[in-house]
Amino acid sequence: ARCASCHQMSASSPVGTDNRFHNVGVSARHQEFEKLANTALEILAKNASKEELDRLALETDISELGRFVVTRNPSDIGAFKTSQVRNVGVTAPYMHDGSMATLWDVIDHYNKGGEANRYLDGGIEPLNLSEAEVTELVAFLFTLTDDRFANSNRAEMDRQRQLAAQRRPFRDEDVASRKVLPFEPRATGKR
């Protein structure tokens, strides 16, 4: 599913991150990036203090611009650091803004290719995973948790499974059931 493109694991780096910044289409659900970026640039041009930048990052929508606030590089709009997957089973909620309650939500988000936006990382494309494959991938992710957290991990998997059975806000039913190809809505402009 191309997860290892960003969540790299090796003997020297067993936590599963490339330590880079990517726009994976999370912030795009909430923001008009260009307008927000222009507002941020106006504020940054006034040489805002470190305290003011911290306040903006913590208390305003400017935080959704991600790395751009630091670099001012448009290619960094909406880009956030790749999180590690070690112990991912016990670290909910997920994504930079905590907007995804379960690992099912995370995989559903990636399965449909994130939220389209002009700054979306080029590696983020629909995955075309079936429901069974989504469930298998989630189960695999729970295996990445250290044995010291085994009890918490089992309880969290059960909790997330129950939540996912009730509500899957990021799931695309047509893609998951393979009624449409995952790229069809983007290619045709139809939903």
Model-predicted regions and their roles:
Residues 1-100, 105-108, 115-118, 152-191:
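Short glycine/threonine-rich turn/loop motifs
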Residues 145-148:
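Short acidic/polar inter-strand loop motif in beta-rich domains
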Residues 114-129, 136:
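C-terminal soluble interaction/assembly domains
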Residues 78, 100, 127-130, 134:
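Solvent-exposed, acidic/flexible segments
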